[in-house]
From Swiss-Prot:
Region (Disordered): 216-240
Keywords associated with the record: Ribonucleoprotein, Ribosomal protein, RNA-binding, rRNA-binding
NCBIfam families the record matches: rpsC_bact
Domain of life where this protein originates: Bacteria
Family: Belongs to the universal ribosomal protein uS3 family.
Protein function: Binds the lower part of the 30S subunit head. Binds mRNA in the 70S ribosome, positioning it for translation.
Pfam families registered for this protein in UniProt: KH_2, Ribosomal_S3_C
GO biological process, one term: translation
Molecular-function GO terms, alphabetical: mRNA binding; rRNA binding; structural constituent of ribosome
Domain KH type-2: start-end pairs: 39-109
Assembly: Part of the 30S ribosomal subunit. Forms a tight complex with proteins S10 and S14.
Protein name: Small ribosomal subunit protein uS3
């Protein structure tokens, strides 16, 4: 079951928290959930080059609090805070009212240990028609330098323009999806290529979270084993 279920949803309430944290009358839930979706869509569309990792949403009466985790806070804030003001104005237009919107920007410290940012990097490279083998190898190397305990990357679709779609994946280190106390960071994104859509999934194992103790630091854990001149486990069928 751990291989099929969403790694974050599987651990909600154990080691993961909801990205939307608010309470409302049951009759208002559908409208507020749709608002959250529109907010995330607007942020992704207008800040697609800012390296957005995640967006946390909280609600207090007539106030909406947003916490944007990004690898490039300067792009989000803008010169003199102009980016924040433009984003706030756009969100008020999306919501259709003048509710107060507070935006807090948080910088992601370990960019190469964030599944969403690694998946976004792979998407950008694939859309530039770079070979998926090279992209996956570079992404794994970046994660190794960030000293994560394990990473798994899966790419699906018409890889390198092959006639028949297939799925290829590579894993380095440990990625224990069945262990609930394991801190698994997961992301899924799609790349629009001239041959069609490619699906990218990234799992990153950062350590174990034990109740009553702090999270096992990836820096103190043993880094991923480096293997000498081992070829990636890919099968080339692009010319068949």
């Amino acid at each position: 079951m751990g291989q099929k279920i969403h790694p974050v949803g599987f651990r909600l309430g154990i080691t993961k928290e909801h990205l939307s944290r608010w309470y409302a009358d049951p009759k208002q839930y559908p409208a507020l959930v749709q608002e959250d979706y529109k907010i995330r869509q607007h942020i992704d569309a207008n800040l697609n080059n800012a390296g957005i990792s995640k967006v946390l949403i909280e609600r207090k009466a007539d106030q909406v609090d947003l916490e944007i985790h990004t690898a490039r806070p300067g792009v989000v804030v803008g010169r003199g805070g102009s980016g924040i003001e433009a984003l706030r104005t756009g969100l008020q237009d999306v919501l259709g009212d003048q509710r107060q919107i507070r935006i807090n920007v948080v910088e992601v410290n370990r960019v190469d240990a964030d599944a969403a940012l690694i998946a976004e990097y792979i998407v950008q490279q694939l859309e530039r028609r770079v070979s998926f083998r090279r992209v996956v190898r570079q992404a794994v190397q970046r994660a190794q330098r960030a000293e994560v305990q394990g990473i798994k990357i899966q790419v699906s679709g018409r890889l390198n323009g092959a006639e028949i779609a297939r799925t290829e994946w590579v894993r380095e280190g440990r990625v224990p999806l069945h262990t609930l106390r394991a801190d698994i960071d997961y992301s899924y994104k799609t790349a629009q290529t001239i041959y069609g859509i490619l699906g990218i999934k990234v799992w990153i194992f950062k350590g174990e979270i034990i109740p009553g103790q702090e999270e096992t630091s990836a820096a103190n854990a043993a880094p991923l084993p480096r293997r000498k001149s081992r070829r990636q486990q890919f099968e080339d069928r692009s010319e068949q």
